[in-house]
């Protein structure tokens, strides 16, 4: 077989190609560096070009110094894709906006506009006219009191609008009718007391609506007729006492519902019957006293349920029936003191995290539940007044990854307990009464990724904290221990471990001091014995004094009445002589 001959000059062609690739690589690197270089822009701002994987090259202008009274748009590059105007909380801006981004030359490439903490009183009618590529507007932390449809004219491609943390009180019908592409609307933390009918007309694509922290008190079903494809609804802290269930019929695709921290006292058994696609439900922070049987019977796709911080004393035996997809359950900070085991039967195979914190539960009630939940990954047991946890408490939960035992009364680190949880990666043992950690405790902690040991009563003497200081400087526990603060002795209270060294620690009590303590104890014992002896002698003397006093009285009486004494003596003699005969039995 003949070998193919390489054509003349082919090696040179390959070498030239390699050189070209090298030159091309250098060119690309230089181009990237040039893209990230600073661009001429106003002194109070920074302008930089970045590269986004999906969007490509993006020119970002950011002004965050604060105390701005005008936006220097005349000095902005008109090709900017992102403009961000913000200010520190202590040094806010005082701005007004109008058609500054549209005239005389519009920012036609602008995709995101953030104007935050700038005391903007109003938006204006044509502030965004012609900005057809604008996708996100963020006007949070301003002083907006009202909005209307003309404020958003021309924003046909806007998908996100953030108006939270303002002072908006009212919005007319069809306020957002020009925002036909809008998917996310955040109106939380305003002063909205009423939602007028057809407020959300033309928002057929809206999937995320946040109305939290507004004094709504009630929700009108007519408001939700135009947003039937809503996926997330948040009405947290809205003073709601109930929700008209007709609303749930109008938003059947809802996947997340947050009604936390309202004023609900009860829920009807068919409350959420229409929300068959619901995956996350928050009812925490209300006034619910009971969860009745089959409350969530139609919510088979529910994965997360929060019932924390209510007034629940009991979960009905069938309260969780049909929740065969439930992964996260929070029943913390209620008044529960016992469980029905059948309550947890429907979720045995799926539940991964459960929070028992802040209830009146004894450990044995929790232990029984954990025995039937072998695949549990996260457990909350905070604020249960625990002084100790048995070493075999998590014997059936070998897959435990996260454990919260904060806000208890633990005085010793639960080393033996944690040796049973080999996969533990997150541990919160803060706000207890731990004073020290031994070397074996620290070795166990080295294997845990996230640890919170703060707010314990750490003793900063060489015996208690010496080993901890050594571990702070030589192991991965550096950051964890550095953040701790001394509780005792008083002269070191509040001092950070980061500022401590072994030499600064209080000296351990010496052997001589220990001996002196023993001697002092013996001396106190001797004093107590002497006091007892002295008391006994005092009592004896008092008795003797009484005896001699009585004898003297008898003698004085005999001296004054000799005849009586003589008669007693004769009577005694007669009794002595005749007594044997008197005691003799009959017939003797």
Show which residues each predicted segment covers.
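Extracellular leucine-rich repeat
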Residues: 2-7, 11-588
């Amino acid at each position: 077989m003949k070998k193919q001959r390489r054509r003349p000059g082919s090696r040179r062609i390959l070498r030239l190609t390699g050189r070209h690739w090298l030159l091309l690589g250098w060119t690309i690197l230089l181009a990237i560096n040039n893209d990230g270089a600073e661009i001429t822009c106003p002194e109070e701002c920074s302008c930089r070009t970045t590269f986004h994987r999906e969007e490509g090259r993006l020119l970002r202008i950011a002004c965050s110094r604060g105390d701005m009274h005008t936006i220097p748009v005349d000095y902005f590059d008109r090709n900017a894709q992102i403009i961000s105007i913000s200010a520190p909380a202590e040094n806010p801006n005082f701005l007004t906006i109008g058609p500054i981004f549209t005239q005389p030359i519009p920012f036609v490439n602008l995709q995101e506009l953030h104007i935050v903490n700038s005391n903007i009183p109003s938006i204006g009618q044509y502030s965004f006219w012609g900005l057809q590529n604008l996708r996100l507007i963020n006007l949070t932390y301003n002083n907006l009191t009202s909005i209307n449809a003309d404020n958003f004219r021309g924003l046909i491609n806007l998908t996100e609008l953030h108006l939270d943390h303002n002072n908006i009180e009212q919005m007319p019908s069809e306020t957002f009718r020009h925002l036909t592409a809008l998917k996310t609307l955040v109106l939380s933390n305003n002063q909205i007391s009423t939602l007028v009918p057809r407020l959300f007309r033309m928002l057929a694509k809206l999937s995320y609506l946040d109305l939290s922290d507004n004094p709504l008190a009630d929700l009108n079903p007519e408001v939700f007729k135009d947003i039937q494809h809503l996926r997330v609804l948040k009405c947290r802290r809205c003073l709601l006492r109930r929700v008209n269930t007709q609303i749930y019929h109008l938003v059947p695709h809802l996947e997340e519902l947050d009604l936390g921290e309202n004023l609900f006292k009860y829920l009807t058994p068919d409350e959420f019957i229409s929300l068959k696609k619901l995956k996350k439900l928050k009812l925490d922070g209300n006034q619910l006293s009971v969860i009745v049987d089959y409350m969530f019977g139609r919510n088979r796709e529910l994965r997360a349920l929060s019932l924390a911080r209510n007034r629940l004393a009991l979960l009905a035996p069938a309260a969780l029936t049909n929740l065969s997809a439930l992964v996260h359950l929070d029943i913390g900070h209620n008044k529960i003191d016992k469980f029905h085991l059948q309550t947890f039967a429907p979720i045995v195979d799926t539940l991964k995290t459960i929070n028992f914190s802040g209830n009146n539960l004894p450990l044995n009630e929790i232990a029984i539940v954990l025995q039937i939940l072998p695949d549990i990954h996260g457990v909350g047991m905070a604020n249960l007044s625990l002084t100790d946890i048995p070493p075999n408490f998590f014997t059936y939960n070998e897959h435990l990854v996260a454990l919260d035992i904060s806000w208890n009364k633990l005085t010793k680190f639960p080393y033996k307990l944690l040796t049973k949880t080999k996969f533990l990666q997150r541990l919160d043992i803060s706000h207890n009464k731990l004073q020290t950690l031994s070397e074996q405790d620290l070795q166990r902690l080295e294997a845990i990724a996230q640890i919170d040991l703060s707010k314990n009563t750490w003793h900063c003497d060489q015996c208690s904290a010496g080993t901890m200081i050594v571990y702070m400087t030589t192991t991965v526990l550096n950051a964890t221990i550095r953040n701790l603060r001394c509780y005792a002795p008083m002269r070191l209270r509040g001092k950070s471990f980061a500022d401590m060294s072994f030499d600064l620690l209080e000296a351990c009590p010496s052997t001589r001091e220990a001996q002196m303590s023993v001697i002092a104890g013996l001396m106190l014992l001797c004093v107590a014995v002497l006091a007892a002896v002295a008391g006994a002698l005092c009592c004896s003397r008092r008795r003797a004094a009484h005896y001699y006093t009585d004898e003297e009285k008898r003698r004085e009486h005999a001296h004054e009445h000799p005849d009586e004494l003589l008669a007693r003596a004769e009577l005694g003699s007669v009794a002595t002589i005749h007594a044997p005969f008197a005691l003799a039995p009959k017939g003797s």
